[in-house]
Design a protein with these regions (language model features):
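Conserved class I S-adenosyl-L-methionine
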Residues: 59-68
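Bacterial N-terminal signal peptides
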Residues: 15-25
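Conserved SAM-binding motif I beta-strand of class I
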Residues: 83-88
Length: 187
């Protein structure tokens, strides 16, 4: 075969290979879990107020849905002796939460779940903390009402749950602005 003919075979094969690699990369990206809510950590003053509002104690199991760096569950374990479950779809956030719990010496009191908070099992939670979005709170609401035991507390930073009236609200000053907290007690 002449050199010119080989060149005509190499170029289409190279293009095909590049196209196949691009399609594989796009397919991987499409399958990777991606958070529905942008990560923004709750300031320390808000974390403290959320746990106080929920009246967290040593018998509680605190679930933080969309846990980010794990600060709420870590503080519940450190300050109140509670157990906790950190749930986040983002593997980097779960790794960060696990590392922070290990640094605090609390990893044995906390379970870490890299999964979609819309499908995570909630039945063991006595307290659920949220800093999500109005839409995500509304999507979670039926599951919270169905799966949580009577007396369970739900505390949301910033967002309510539509026409489900909170049992209490609290404004917290974080040094820059006032932030609203909502508490519901499951009946």
């Amino acid at each position: 075969m002449r050199a010119g003919n080989r060149r005509h075979l190499v170029i289409p094969r190279t293009r095909t290979l590049i196209l196949a690699l691009c399609l594989a990369a796009c397919s991987q990206a499409a399958q990777a879990p991606w958070p529905d809510v942008r990560y923004e950590p709750s300031p320390p003053e808000v974390v403290t107020a959320m746990l106080e509002l929920a009246a967290v104690g040593p018998r509680d199991v605190v679930y933080d849905l969309g846990c980010g760096d794990g600060r709420i569950v870590i503080e519940a374990a450190r300050r109140y002796g509670a157990r906790g479950v950190c749930v986040d779809i983002d593997p980097e956030r779960i790794a960060e939460a696990r590392n922070n719990a290990a640094a605090a010496g609390l990893v044995e009191r906390i379970t870490f779940r890299q999964e979609d908070l819309l499908v995570t099992e909630l039945g063991r939670a006595s307290v659920v903390t949220l800093f999500l979005s109005p839409d995500m709170n509304l999507r979670l609401r039926p599951r919270l009402q169905l799966e949580l035991a009577s007396g369970a507390r739900i505390v949301s930073h910033w967002h309510d749950m539509g026409d489900w009236r909170p049992d209490r609200t609290r404004a917290v000053w974080d040094g820059k602005r006032s932030r609203q907290l909502f508490l519901w007690v499951k009946r």
